[in-house]
A protein has these predicted regions:
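Metal-coordinating catalytic core of metallo-dependent amide/deamination hydrolases
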Residues: 7-10
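C-terminal extensions of enzymes
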Residues: 137-179
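Shared catalytic-loop signature of beta/alpha-barrel
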Residues: 12, 21, 29-46, 51-149
Length: 179
């Protein structure tokens, strides 16, 4: 979000480098100017911080503000909304990629499953949990495969087993709810 439309000559120069995309170059709340910019350059724009819901996604695509969408489940309200955005983008031939937000292994399990959907055709912002956590709250270690992928967990539920000792160790507050 560091640029404005006054930087159009810079963006046109960037076109010469055949970049895969330029992510969120303008203000997060300005899909109108993103649409103007996208019409002027060859490089695909990817909206990230502008996307908080399916409604934002629809508006951005209909206005021509981008050709790629970054989906971050934590930003859009969870996996149900993420799946709706994925499906809508697929119906409009707009590729998506997954952005992570430093989730624990529980969130990472959901993110890896989400990123395995068919319209996530760009490399996703997912990494091994050891990159950020010396000890995670799941037993499963997410590792990069030699081809750069991460295997989708296949266990029951979200596919991973919670490390109850680690969860207890890192819990800062408990609340009991009576039926």
């Amino acid at each position: 979000s560091a640029y404005t439309l006054n930087h159009l000559p810079v963006f046109k120069k960037m076109d010469e480098y055949n970049l895969s995309l330029i992510e969120q170059p303008l203000g997060y709340d300005d899909i109108f100017d993103h649409a103007k910019l996208q019409r002027e350059i060859k490089t695909d724009l990817c909206l990230d911080e502008s996307i908080h819901s399916l409604g934002d996604t629809r508006a951005a695509i209909e206005m021509g503000s981008c050709r790629i969408i970054n989906i971050k489940p934590g930003r859009v309200g969870g996996y149900t909304e993420s799946k709706k955005i994925h499906d809508y983008c697929a119906s409009k031939n707009i590729p998506v990629w997954h952005g992570g937000m430093l989730e624990s292994g529980i969130g990472r399990a959901g993110n890896v499953a989400l990123a395995s959907l068919p319209n996530f055709i760009l490399p996703s912002d997912l990494s091994p949990n050891r990159k950020y956590y010396t000890e995670d709250i799941v037993e499963t270690l997410f590792e990069l495969n030699p081809d750069g992928t991460i295997t989708v967990p296949t266990g029951p539920g979200i596919g991973v087993e919670v490390n109850m000792k680690a969860l207890e160790k890192y819990t800062v507050k408990k609340c009991e709810q009576k039926a």
